[in-house]
């Protein structure tokens, strides 16, 4: 078994990757990137014809996910997500003291959408669901 979760990889990088790393400016590599990502936000705004304040950029997927939890899940009701899914949903729920309920997948590891048809504080419907690799059609979502 090869573990590929959490950006781990048992294989060395491709030769081109090592060459690219060597060509980087080591002075810039010692600093954190711009936390506002202003250049990226400006380029995205221009490309998509949006105002800069309509674009949110995080410093990684876990950061973006944390901001989503803080923004969208602010009810006393529990949020719902599958019992077999990305391992950080319950972590953020615990950190931010958001009640949650894990909904069991069916015998084919699919989300049972009817389990989510009741009062809740929000739903996380991962699609595709990373651990299972199953992607549902838009009509299911």
List the model feature ranges, each with a label:
Residues 29-141:
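Conserved core of the PLP fold type I
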Residues 1-31, 117-127:
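N-terminal "arm"/small-domain region of PLP-dependent enzymes with the aminotransferase-like
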């Amino acid at each position: 078994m090869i573990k590929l979760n959490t950006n781990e990889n048992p294989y060395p990088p491709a030769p081109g990757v090592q060459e690219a790393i060597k060509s980087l400016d080591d002075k810039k590599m010692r600093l954190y990137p711009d936390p506002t990502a202003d250049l990226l936000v400006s380029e995205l705004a221009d490309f998509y014809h949006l105002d800069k304040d309509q674009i949110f950029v995080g410093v990684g997927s876990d950061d973006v996910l944390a901001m989503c939890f803080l923004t969208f899940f602010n009810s006393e009701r529990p949020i719902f997500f599958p019992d077999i899914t990305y391992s950080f949903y319950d972590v953020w729920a615990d950190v931010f003291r958001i009640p949650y309920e894990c909904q069991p997948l069916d015998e084919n590891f699919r989300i049972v959408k009817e389990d989510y048809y009741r009062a809740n504080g929000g739903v996380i419907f991962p699609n595709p669901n990373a651990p299972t690799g199953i992607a549902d059609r838009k009509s299911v979502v």
